[in-house]
Curated annotation (Swiss-Prot):
This is Ion-translocating oxidoreductase complex subunit E. HAMAP family: RsxE_RnfE. Its EC number is 7.-.-.-. Disulfide bonds: none annotated. The gene is rnfE. Belongs to the NqrDE/RnfAE family. It comes from Yersinia pseudotuberculosis serotype O:3 (strain YPIII). Its main location: membrane. It comes from the Bacteria. One of its GO terms (cellular component) is plasma membrane.
């Protein structure tokens, strides 16, 4: 398997930052009340990861090891500020909905962790791909949790998609369950913890089934001993 495929497999599934490393749980639980909010924050985090990894990798030969962490934080803060201004300019509704959790990307352990563990030691191209894979892995986890909570809580999917994609995206709203009153447990923090637990359990079950399938498909071919080979002849 090539290095690029390994990075994608690690980021999207095997070493998923949200479901395996359990990093960035604060925004994961707080913002995932709807699929739109979850997708918006996930894409913003992915953009920050790609830009940060690219910058850290490009500057890795000139950054003194003694002060590398403060420099990484400054790079991350600069990128996050730029992303925050872009969201404020082009998706103001989403900006208001996400609130403080956009600037809090600066403190997200996923971002500083990938900068230190991978980008500071590898070429620019692979570092950017690592940031993309890790970001999309977190985005997928955020989106699934947000969609699950929105469906169970409000009976809808992609409600408020126009905040992220523009006025045309109102047609994306889907009414799945017709609820007389919202199911508050799914929308409140306890529902976020329960939903995350279900996702973790689901990933564990899938991983175990994949392991069992691989074990069953292994075919061991017994080698004939010399004596058996002579008898066969």
């Amino acid at each position: 398997m090539s290095e690029a495929k390994k990075l994608l497999a690690q980021g999207l599934w095997k070493n998923n930052s949200a479901l395996v490393q359990l990093l960035g749980l604060c925004p994961l639980l707080a913002v995932s009340s709807t699929a739109t909010n979850a997708l918006g924050l996930g894409l913003a985090t992915t953009l920050v990861l790609v830009c940060t990894n690219t910058a850290v990798s490009a500057l890795r030969r000139w950054v003194p090891s003694e002060i590398r962490i403060p420099i990484y934080v400054m790079i991350i803060a600069s990128v996050v500020s730029t992303v925050q201004m872009l969201i404020n300019a082009y998706a103001f509704g989403l900006y208001q909905s996400l609130g403080i959790f956009i600037p809090l990307i600066v403190t997200n352990c996923i971002v500083i962790g990938r900068a230190e563990a991978y980008a500071a030691k590898n070429p620019v191209g692979l570092s950017a791909l690592d940031g993309f894979a890790m970001g999309m892995g977190a985005t997928c986890a955020l989106f699934v949790l947000g969609a699950l909570r929105e469906i169970l809580g409000n009976g809808t999917l992609f409600d408020g998609a126009d905040m992220l994609l523009g006025s045309w995206a109102t047609v994306l709203r889907i009414d799945i369950l017709h609820l007389d009153t919202p199911f508050l447990l799914a929308m409140l923090p306890p529902g976020a913890f329960i939903g995350l637990g279900l996702l973790l359990a689901g990933k564990y079950v899938i991983d175990e089934k994949m392991k069992a399938r691989k074990a069953n498909t292994r075919v061991s071919v017994p080698q004939l001993q010399d004596g058996d080979a002579e008898k066969a002849l």
